[in-house]
């Protein structure tokens, strides 16, 4: 048995389950494993150079012929170049962490790609719907990384109401990890679920085993939403570094951000000019202070230290609240099959209540 939803029909995937484009986590191995398991895997390109993204796409295509996606920073200076790369390589889905410009949406749709931005409010849902988005991901406050204050149980129905009548599939994110959640999301009216932390904690994830163990040790109160990482609300595991950031001075955090800006420039091969240009775009788009723009350089380097280098003391571990309830490391195939079968069981049980 399978679940057929507007999402599975739109993209041509077997199951309405999406693996989100987590920086430093969603590489070729995880994405291809998700795709081969019947879900939608999304490559995280924000922490890749253009050449690295091209190489990652090639790796995915070498081991799967199933649809997959690429997540792009809509405010990046080279967003257009990344879109053109996706089009040349025939990538099925373009995912955006911010609302992309109308021109980018039009270019992708002209090429036959499916455009799926992530949004955090009903007003944003209405905007991207009017601009021609094919679907959207809505993440509630339970989700990891940059997040908002509204729980999925309230944000999801508000977004569904905002786009009612448009036929645009809405994908629920934030707090999902099993079949019960998928069944609940479908009952709300969503077309599927997107998960980050749950896919990070699989055997197909390249995150170091020691870091995975640190996630599995977390309790339900083991995450915190902090603004000390990059100036914006960021849900992360409560680690020693995070506690220091929370209790330390802002001046010290600002100085650390300046050092990390230099490290990120060298790692990404970006010029100071392009970083400043991206900063100007970011500041205008989100109405941030210059301090917050500079602090944003903390994010990629601190996440890399934890998720790639395995240094949980010097790095930051973005995490959804679901980390506190997870206790296993299944393969993507095992995970998706279990979620779908469990969801079908719960939907059948619920339907039996109706007389």
From Swiss-Prot:
Keyword Oxidoreductase: yes
Catalyzed reactions per annotation: (3aS,4S,5R,7aS)-5-hydroxy-7a-methyl-1-oxo-octahydro-1H-indene-4-carboxyl-CoA + NAD(+) = (5R,7aS)-5-hydroxy-7a-methyl-1-oxo-2,3,5,6,7,7a-hexahydro-1H-indene-carboxyl-CoA + NADH + H(+)
Enzyme Commission number(s): 1.3.1.-
Molecular function, one GO term: nucleotide binding
Any matching Pfam family: NMO
Pathway: Steroid metabolism; cholesterol degradation
Binding residues annotated for FMN, in chain numbering: 21-23, 173-175, 196-197
Domain of life the protein comes from: Bacteria
Record entry for activity regulation: Requires the presence of IpdF.
Top enzyme category: oxidoreductase
Keywords recorded for this protein, A-Z: Cholesterol metabolism, Flavoprotein, FMN, Lipid metabolism, NAD, Nucleotide-binding, Oxidoreductase, Steroid metabolism, Sterol metabolism
Gene Ontology BP annotations: cholesterol catabolic process
Phenotype caused by lack of the gene: Deletion mutant does not grow on cholesterol, but grows as the wild-type on glycerol. In the presence of cholesterol, disruption mutant accumulates 5OH-HIC-CoA.
Gene Ontology cellular-component annotations: plasma membrane
Known function: Involved in the final steps of cholesterol and steroid degradation. Probably catalyzes the introduction of a double bound into the C ring of 5OH-HIC-CoA, leading to the formation of (5R,7aS)-5-hydroxy-7a-methyl-1-oxo-3,5,6,7-tetrahydro-2H-indene-4-carboxyl-CoA.
PANTHER family on file: 2-NITROPROPANE DIOXYGENASE, 2-NITROPROPANE DIOXYGENASE-LIKE PROTEIN
Similarity remark: Belongs to the nitronate monooxygenase family.
Record-given protein name: (3aS,4S,5R,7aS)-5-hydroxy-7a-methyl-1-oxo-octahydro-1H-indene-4-carboxyl-CoA dehydrogenase
Organism: Mycobacterium tuberculosis (strain ATCC 25618 / H37Rv)
Organism placement in taxonomy: Bacteria, Bacillati, Actinomycetota, Actinomycetes, Mycobacteriales
């Amino acid at each position: 048995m399978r679940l057929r939803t507007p999402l599975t029909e739109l993209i041509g995937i077997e199951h309405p389950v999406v693996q989100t484009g987590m920086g430093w986590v969603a590489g070729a191995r995880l994405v291809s494993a998700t795709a081969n398991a019947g879900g939608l895997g999304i490559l995280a390109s924000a922490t890749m150079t253009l050449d690295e993204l091209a190489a990652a796409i090639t790796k995915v295509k070498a081991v799967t012929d199933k649809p997959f996606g690429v997540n792009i920073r809509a405010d990046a200076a080279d967003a257009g170049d990344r879109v053109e790369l996706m089009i040349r390589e025939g990538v099925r889905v373009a995912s955006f962490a911010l609302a992309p410009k109308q021109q980018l949406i039009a270019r992708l749709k002209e090429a036959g790609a499916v455009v799926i931005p992530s949004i955090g409010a009903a007003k944003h849902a209405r905007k991207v719907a009017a601009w021609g988005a094919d679907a959207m991901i809505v993440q509630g406050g339970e989700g990891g990384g940059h997040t908002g204050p509204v729980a999925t149980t309230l944000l999801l129905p508000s977004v569904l109401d905002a786009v009612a009548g448009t036929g645009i599939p809405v994908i629920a994110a934030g707090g999902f990890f099993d079949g019960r959640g998928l069944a609940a999301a479908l009952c709300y009216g969503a077309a599927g679920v997107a998960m980050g932390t749950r896919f990070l904690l699989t055997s197909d994830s390249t995150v170091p085993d020691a870091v995975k163990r640190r996630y599995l040790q977390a309790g339900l109160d083991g995450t915190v939403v902090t603004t000390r990482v990059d100036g914006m609300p960021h849900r992360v595991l409560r680690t020693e570094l995070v506690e220091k950031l929370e209790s330390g001075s802002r001046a010290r955090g600002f100085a650390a951000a300046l050092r990390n800006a230099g490290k990120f420039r060298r790692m990404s091969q970006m010029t100071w000019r392009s970083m400043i240009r991206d900063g100007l775009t970011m500041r205008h788009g989100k109405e941030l202070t210059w301090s917050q723009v500079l602090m944003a350089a903390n994010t990629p380097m601190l996440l890399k230290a934890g998720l790639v280098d395995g240094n949980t003391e010097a790095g930051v571990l973005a995490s959804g609240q679901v980390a506190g309830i997870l206790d296993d490391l299944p393969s993507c195939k095992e995970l998706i099959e279990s979620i779908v079968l469990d969801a079908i069981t719960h939907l059948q049980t619920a339907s039996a209540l109706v007389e």
